[in-house]
A protein has these predicted regions:
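Ser/Thr-rich, Pro/Gly/Ala-heavy low-complexity intrinsically disordered linkers and tails
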Residues: 9-56
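Beta-strand-rich recognition/accessory modules
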Residues: 68-76, 81-83, 89-90, 94-96, ...
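Acidic, contiguous internal or C-terminal segments within carbohydrate-active enzymes
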Residues: 116, 120-133, 178-258
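C-terminal functional module detector
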Residues: 190, 468-486, 497, 508-517, ...
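A short, solvent-exposed beta-strand micro-motif common in secreted/extracellular proteins
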Residues: 323-324, 420-431, 510-515, 528-539
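A short, amphipathic beta-strand motif
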Residues: 375-385, 412, 453, 459-472, ...
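Short, ordered, surface-exposed loop/turn motifs in non-cytosolic proteins
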Residues: 376, 383-409, 468-508, 884
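A metal-dependent hydrolase metal-coordination microenvironment
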Residues: 544, 566-724, 747-750, 770-772, ...
Length: 1016
């Protein structure tokens, strides 16, 4: 642990300033500003009022000194942005007028004005843009692929900077500098207590109010690509303060985390208990730009990296580093600094913003830390006669096989600076894995080693596949190509790439989406030679091509075929209402790539639901020429850590706000919003649909509500003893938590129905993953809560949690253009002309449920005079998929909640029967599997009823969905080539028919009399 003493004074002057409202007015770009002050006009935080004039307060005398100005042509400047022209560009640039800019001829950084929003990094005063200025990119424009960098104190606190202003404008030839002053504040948009607290790991009070005054200084020297940030913490209390110092990075763009000794990829919860080396620095490695972050301690002798390195953890897509700790367990349980009363400690970071690759960052780190024995390795990489493959990298490993760094291959060449020593170099591409290892010995003193590396000769797979509609029209359409076979262990790519960002399913060598399903347009697939099963598909409404291919080195094999539309869902739109793109911190998938996947999986309507930011998919769809094939709307997933995730759509974009108009579920500087308050906030923003996202699980809506259902009383209640108090969830005391003001709930999240990963979500291990949510849903229906069941993917990648599975079918609106759904079918109150609740949830099979007179789900139906109710059920799947083999019908089923025993979990449908299929011609040359049955239910006039139909199977939906597989390379047919087990079985669920048993024209929930009077 480090005890840090007061530091020297700060050179420079306080100049232009910014407020939360916008730019300062009436202040020049040079000379010290001395605003008037008095009892009614206080000075900025950190300043003092002397004889009616504001001046620098004591904390300014504790800040690190800036280097003296230099006489040189190069200059750096600091300014308050008065308009957008003062701000750097880049696709992830979020700076707005009123923010402060530091820039030179290489880079620009934006420091946000005092601000508050609902992002993962909620307060202003931090770096929000790190930009390589134009000319360093093929397009010649500014490049920004980084989100925000924020200090973290006490593991769960940060700083609410109340004052941000220019400290030195750079006109003296020295560093341009900005100073921000604030106090510690709860990091309320990330509640680590709700995650780590359940494991009894934390030793810090995450709601503490520390006696700290904090001053940040951001400085940029002329000609440098590195920003230096320092955070000086003045202990204004009367006792020594033990705390923890750390940093958080939101690497929002197309960059992969890289940690020396571990390689690429986020360090997640599964690695907390692993013996991982601490990080000397962090790199964020991208194809267009890379960033380096070097944590720093400041003492009277200057700035230096922690000798012990830093413990690193990735959480919800953001990267946290705790200084001077070897691992996360010690980081969350031990302080790393003691600040005596009345004294200060300073820590910070250097941020490199114009690196080419991780190797560039590594060299920057070596030189920043004073390494004297540095040599250079230069080389070429070839991949057969065609030269180095696009996107290739060279991984550098030490003698023990640990990752040191990785270099991009540009125009067939690469270079990397290394400390003297022995290393292994391994070339790699994402499709071919790691190549053979080459040993090199690096001499110090600037010596250069030349090496030639070669990747194995790849094989090629070309394809030309057309799609034929039910009406016989043939055209080019998007498709998915999956290549399945024996995967060599060398495809573990962490040394060169992030293999866990969107990992391939078991046995898959490649998954490729094609806009036209023709390699003449996007090139053949290049992979390792071998024997594979190639599967070309276009979602569950079409046939598929399955062909065994023997791919030889240097040769290209071609598949030619036609995909047939075989399932007729006419009048219905396939919707995914829970998807993530690169706008979410835990997704790295470009919008265009995501849209291409949805085109290939044959989904018609998309709701963007990035975490706490609004993303408009429409412009990207238009640029791809896809606006006639799918339609989109804007939504949000409000991602509370403590009590669940909630979706609202459609929403308007607010372009002048960094979150683009997403609600601040953490409540600004007050208590966080309850579910009830958040639903209202989403409505106020314009949401027509409010949705519970994966509501089961240890911190989900159901659990946090402590919702119970008394089967004998037929009533919901709340287990107040089990419910976490509002104060522990950072909610307002006395505020009611539960609300029924939602429209939809995800009865199936993901292809398996259980939610993200299925680890803490969904049903018990002895039942289908969706059953837990369905039990709640059925109980809601029985007491008259109008909740529509939907299915969504919650897709963060292209392969894992695949786009479009589960999906929801709902009625289409009339008119021309791409299919759009009637969102009135999802509204709790319905809409004029809408078939309320005419909704099907599925991970593949098509399910049609029709009551008397052809009534669709959501309709009010009346039994025959003898009380019998006939329901016609049809299930269709293409022949390449395993169909559901069992039909279940539920009517007024109610369950004890929580269901903790097998008996309580028993679903007990009122009717079950096996489904029998026949092959039926479909469209022009296609074949579909179809099962049709008539279910007859006997009703009484004792109570009205709801009826839900579910089709469910036991065999995996492979190859549409991943599965555990066994491969027989000697087999001659696709059926024998792969045996799939333990995959995701098929399911489809129809929303309820409402049965008016006594024919009075009204429907009364069967247990309405037993429903609690409040808050329903």
């Amino acid at each position: 642990m480090l005890t840090i003493v007061p530091l020297g004074g700060m050179a420079g002057c306080a100049e232009d300033s910014a407020s939360e409202e916008g730019p300062a007015e009436g202040e020049g770009s040079g000379g010290e500003v001395e605003p008037a002050c008095g009892p009614e006009v206080p000075c900025a935080l950190g300043d003092t009022c002397t004889e009616g004039v504001c001046g620098r307060g004591p904390i300014h005398d504790l800040l690190p000194e800036l280097p003296a100005g230099q006489v040189a042509e190069e200059r750096a400047e600091a300014l308050v942005a008065e308009g957008m022209a003062d701000l750097p560009g880049g696709r992830f640039a979020v700076g707005r007028p009123g923010d402060l800019v530091l820039r030179n001829d290489r880079v620009a950084f934006v420091i946000q004005r005092p601000h508050r929003d609902g992002s993962l990094t909620p307060y202003g005063g931090n770096v929000i843009d790190a930009v390589r200025l134009g000319g360093g990119d093929a397009g010649g424009g500014d490049v920004d692929e980084l989100g925000e960098v924020m200090p973290v104190l006490h593991i769960g606190l940060t700083v609410d900077f109340e004052s941000v202003r220019v400290l030195n404008d750079g006109s003296d030839g020295g560093p341009a500098a900005v100073v921000a002053v604030g106090r510690d504040a709860i990091w309320d948009t990330v509640d680590l207590g709700s995650l780590l607290g359940r494991f009894d790991l934390l030793r810090f009070d995450l709601n503490a109010d520390l006696p700290l005054l904090v001053a940040a200084v951001y400085s940029l020297e002329p000609g440098s690509g590195t920003l230096r940030a320092s955070f000086t913490l003045l202990n204004e209390g009367e006792e020594p303060l033990e705390t923890s110092l750390g940093l958080v990075v939101d690497p929002r763009g197309a960059v992969d985390d890289f940690v020396p000794g571990r390689g690429h990829g986020a360090v997640g919860f599964d690695e907390i208990f692993a013996s991982l080396p601490p990080a000397p620095y962090l790199a964020f490695h991208g194809a267009r730009i890379s960033y380096g972050l070097l944590p720093l301690h400041f003492t009277s002798e200057g700035a230096h990296p922690p000798a012990e390195g830093s413990a690193v953890l990735n959480l919800q897509g953001i990267t946290a580093a705790v200084l001077g700790k070897p691992d996360i367990l010690r980081a969350v349980s031990e302080p790393n600094v003691t600040i005596p009363a009345g004294e200060a400690a300073t820590f910070g970071y250097d941020l490199l913003a114009d690196a080419t690759d991780a190797a560039d960052v590594h060299e920057w780190w070596l030189r920043s830390t004073g390494e004297e024995s540095i040599g250079m390795v230069r080389g070429t990489l070839t991949g057969a006669a065609a030269g180095a493959p696009e996107g290739a990298r060279v991984a550098v490993l030490d003698e023990a096989g640990r990752s040191v760094t990785a270099a991009q291959v540009v125009d067939g060449g690469f270079e990397v600076a290394l400390a003297a020593g022995s290393y292994q170099l391994r070339p790699a591409t994402r499709s071919q894995g790691l190549g053979e290892s080459t040993a090199v010995t690096v001499e110090g003193g600037g010596a250069t080693e030349d090496v030639d590396l070669q990747l194995p000769e790849p094989a090629g797979l070309a394809y030309a596949v057309r799609t034929r509609s039910l009406g016989g029209e043939e055209r080019s359409a998007a498709c998915r190509l999956s290549l399945i076979g024996a995967v060599p262990p060398e495809l573990e790519l962490r040394a060169a790439f992030d293999p866990r960002k969107d990992p391939l399913p078991p046995g898959h060598v490649a998954v490729h989406y094609s806009r036209t399903c023709d390699s003449a347009d996007d090139g053949p697939l290049r992979v390792r030679p071998g024997r594979y099963l190639a599967v070309i598909s276009r979602g569950p409404r079409h046939s598929a091509v399955q062909e065994i291919v023997d791919l030889e080195p240097g040769e290209t094999t071609t598949i030619r075929a036609t995909l047939h539309e075989v399932v007729d869902t006419g009048g219905y739109v396939a919707m995914d209402c829970h998807i993530h793109t690169i706008g979410s911190p835990d997704s790295k998938i470009e919008i265009e790539a995501k849209l291409l996947a949805y085109l290939a999986e044959d989904v018609d309507f998309l709701v963007s639901t990035d975490h706490d930011v609004l993303t408009d998919l429409g412009p990207a769809a238009a640029s791809m020429g896809a606006e006639g094939e799918l339609s989109t709307t804007v939504g949000v997933e409000s991602t509370t850590f403590a009590h669940g995730h909630y979706i609202g759509f459609p929403l308007p974009i607010a372009p002048d706000i960094p979150t683009r108009g997403a609600p601040d579920w953490a409540g600004g500087r007050g208590p966080s919003l309850t579910a009830n308050q958040l639903f209202a906030a989403l409505r106020d923003l314009g949401a027509e649909v409010v949705q519970l996202a994966h509501p089961a699980g240890f911190s989900g809506f159901f659990a946090r509500s402590a919702l119970t259902f008394d089967l004998e009383a037929g009533a919901f209640g709340f287990d107040t003893a089990a419910r976490t108090p509002n104060e522990e969830l950072r909610l307002g005391p006395g505020e009611p938590f539960f609300s029924d003001a939602f429209d939809t709930l995800e009865i199936a999240t993901g292809a398996g129905g259980a939610g993200p990963g299925g680890r803490f979500f969904g049903g018990a291990s002895d039942e289908p993953g969706m059953n837990d949510v369905m039990r709640h849903w059925f109980d809601f229906l029985s007491v008259g809560m109008p909740a529509v069941g939907v299915g969504c993917s919650d897709s963060h990648g292209l392969v894992e949690r695949a786009p479009g599975y589960a999906r929801t079918y709902l009625p289409a609106l009339g008119g021309g253009g791409p299919a759009r759904p009637d969102l009135g079918a999802l509204s709790a109150t319905g809409a004029a002309g809408a078939r309320h609740g005419d909704v099907i949830v599925t991970n593949g099979p098509w399910l049609s449920v029709r009551g008397p007179g052809g009534a669709a789900p959501g309709a009010l139906v009346t039994p025959d005079e003898d009380g019998s109710l006939e329901i016609e059920v049809t299930v269709e799947v293409p022949t390449w998929l395993a169909p559901p083999d069992q039909l279940e019908v539920f009517a007024n089923n109610t369950y004890t909640l929580p269901a903790s025993t097998p008996a309580e979990r028993a679903m007990e449908p009122v009717h079950e029967e096996p489904l029998e299929y026949e092959e039926v011609p479909a469209g022009d040359g296609g074949v579909v599997l179809r099962a049709t049955t008539i279910v007859t239910l006997a009703t009484t006039q004792d109570e009205d009823a709801w009826v839900v139909v579910r089709a469910i199977g036991g065999e995996p939906l492979f190859p549409l969905m991943p599965a555990s597989i066994e491969i027989d390379l000697a087999a001659e047919t696709p059926e024998r080539f792969i045996t799939a087990t333990e995959g995701r079985p098929p399911f489809a669920v129809a929303n309820p028919l409402f049965v008016d048993t006594n024919g009075d024209g009204a429907w009364v929930a069967p247990l309405l009399a037993g429903a609690p009077s409040s808050p329903f």
